[in-house]
Structure formats: structure tokens, C-alpha cells
Amino acid sequence: MMHLNRVHLEEKRAYWAMVMPAFALYLLVMAFPIILSIMLSVSNYSGGKMFGGEKWGFAGFSAYARVFTDPWFWNALKNNLYIVLISVFGQLPLGFIFAYFIYSKIVRAPSFWQGVLYVPNIISVIVVGLLWQVIFSPHGPIAEIVNSIHASSFQGQLKAIFDGAGGFSLSDNVIKKILHLAGPSGQAMFSDPVPELRDLLASYNGQPISEIYTALSNLFVQKWSPAFLTKTDIAMLPVLFVILWMYTGMYLILFLANMQKIDAQIIESARIDGANEGQVMRYIILPALSGTIVNSAILAISGSLSSFALIFAMTGGGPSRVTEILSIYMYNNAFLGRPNFPLANAISLIMVLISVVLIVLTKAVEKRYGGKEE
């Protein structure tokens, strides 16, 4: 009996010896920061004596009250909700549709499209943010393409004017047509448009006609300078587009992997019985993927509250804080200007609470509609 007790005791010791390191690591990495964050959020901590701050003491829930009365908190929360919506109702449906196209072999070279759509997920988030910042910049590729199209169109119309006159001409009719093509802004460049433009064209005489077209288009065609990330009324739209573009491929892979688990004979039998593609999707594929859809929605919601790196690289929360999200709002309060650690920790805990509420709602919807988690 004593031998059995000793063996049992040794088994317990071995069990705790294996569990305790992992448990201690959990306390250090997860539990301790959460407890510390709660303590800081209800304190007046301002860096401690080491950093010239006040003595640490209890301050109640003043930080939470300040968060909820700050209009910038509601602005950041609104932007986070936009990201949740574009993630759940944008990334998931698109990922599902693309996965179905590849699964059903509706598109050619499905492996190629699978790889292309997944590529954004393997690129560094910071690199993606900086890349799209350049693309959307006033002198980026979008602006260059649009301006080159405008210039080509203008030069084509110039060519038609000169061809109609039998070649390069300084006649009043040609001058007036060019001024009409240039529009009011072009005409406003001259105090006396017809003779001044004739003198300008005369100075080009003898040059290759293509260079004349280029010179006139540079003079009269106004450069379009997009301000996608600097206009307060539209700055959030390109951010949402990039988020949609970047993560749709991840859900494509999740949905495709689970579609491939469905017994092909079931789908084939349904088609033999007369089911069309819509019925196959509705009655076979969607029910089979209900758990995956819910899990993907939870993943999308949690990811929507952690978009700090991408938006910080693209806009920094600007212009005028219109693209600021909760994580950037928290960062600004913690590290910019005079740090407010209680406020920043209160924001972080509110973010956790929002995430939990959204996930609980998602699980409730799953339960309501009979989904089964895989």
C-alpha cells in the first residue's frame, strides 16, 4: 500500500514538474500583463518616481470616464467597426466565392489564382502599408497612369487639328481650335490668347511634331494629383480597400481546404438528381462549412481590432485623425506627448471587451441558425 502511495505521489510530482513551467510562462506572458493593465487603468500612474511621475495610487474609474467622453474614442471605434464590417461582409464572402470558383474549376489554372490571391498574406504588413502609401500618393503609379492617359488623349486631338489643317499651321482657325481644346484654364494663361499662342507655336517651328505635341500637352493638360490618403472625407476608403485586398486570400485558403473535405460523391449525386450550382452551394457546401464560416468570422473580428501596423504605415492615423483606430488611439495616449498610461490601459481593456462581445454575438448567431463548429 505504501508502495502504491509512493508511486502515486511520484506521478503527481512528475505531473506538476511538467505542468508548472508552462503554467509559470502563461502567468508571466498572459495573466500578469492583464492584471497589471487592470491595475494601471484604475491608477494615477504617470511613470513613477524613476521618470519624475507622481506616487502610484488608486484613482478609480476616471480613465474609463475620460475615454467614453472623448470624441476621438468614438471616432476610432467607428473606424474599427468599419474594418469589422469590411472583414466579415467583404473578406469572407469574397474568400468563399473565390474558393468555390477554384474548387469547382470554373476558372482556368486554379493553382495559379490560389497562389496569386494568397500572396498578400506572406508580405510584411509594414511593407504592404508603405507600398500602398506610394501607390495612392499624388505622384504614385495611379496618378502617372491617369495623367499619361489625359496627355495621350490631348495629343491625339492636337494631331487631329493639325492633320485637318494639312500639317503644322499658325492659322487663326488652328489657333482657336487649340485654345478651345485647352479650355478656360488654358486660355487664362494668356492676356491676348490668339496672337500669344501663335507666337508660342512659331517658336516651336522646325521641331519634330511629336515634341510640339508633348510641349503643348505639358502646357495645357493639368496634372491630376490624387489625394486619397490626405482628404479627410475619403481617406478611410483606401485603407478599407487594402484590408480587403490583403486578407481575402487567407479565407480563400480556409474555405477551399474545407470544401475539399466534402465527399465529391454527394455533390455528384445531387447534380445527377438535377441540382444546379446554387442549390449545391446552398444545401451542401454552406451547411458543411458553417463551422468554418463562424470560426473565420471570429478570426476576422479579432483581426479587425489589431490593424495597427498596416494603418500606421499607410496614414499614421491621419489626416486629422480620420483613419485613427483604437490601437493607434491607445498608442498615441501611451507614447506621444505626455504619456497617459491609465488612459492607454483603459483603452486596451475596452478593446478586449469589444472583441469578446463581438465574438459572443457571432457564436450566438451560429447557435441561432444551427451551425456546428468544426
Where are these regions (language model features)?
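N-terminal leader/signal peptides at the extreme start of proteins
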Residues: M1-V7
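A structural signal for multi-pass alpha-helical bundles of membrane permease subunits
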Residues: V7-E374
